C-alpha cells in the first residue's frame, strides 16, 4: 500500500483551536480519521489525554468529518433527539447544544431545508452532544459563503472557553 501519513508528531494544547494546513493529499483528513478511530494507523501510536488512545476515548471526542450525518426529513431538535436517545442523554442537552450553535429558532423546519451553514452547525451540535474534550472538524467551512464562514469561525473560537479543544 501507499504511505499517506509518515513521521507526524502533534502536541495540541488543551482548550485551544489547532488547525492542520497543507496541500491536497498531504494526509490531513487521514490523520483526523485516525484520531477518531475511523482508520487504524499501521504503525506508531496516538496519545490522548496523557495515555495511549483507546476506543473508550471516543466518549470524549466529538467529530464532524466532511458532511454532517443528518436525517433530512427531521427537524434540528429531532435529529439531536435520535442521538440523545442512543447516548442516554437528557432532552436538556438538546436545548443546550442548539443554543451553542444558534439553531434554537428553526422550529418545525426540516434539516433538508436548511442552508449549508445551518447544516454544518447542526452537525457540530451532534458532535457536541456528549460534552467532548476534543472536537475534530474536517473542513467545516467547505461550501459556505463568506458570512457563513465568519459565523462558523466565531462559533469555533468560542469553544476553548467552554473547555473544548478544537
Where are these regions (language model features)?
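ABC transporter nucleotide-binding domains
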Residues: 2-166
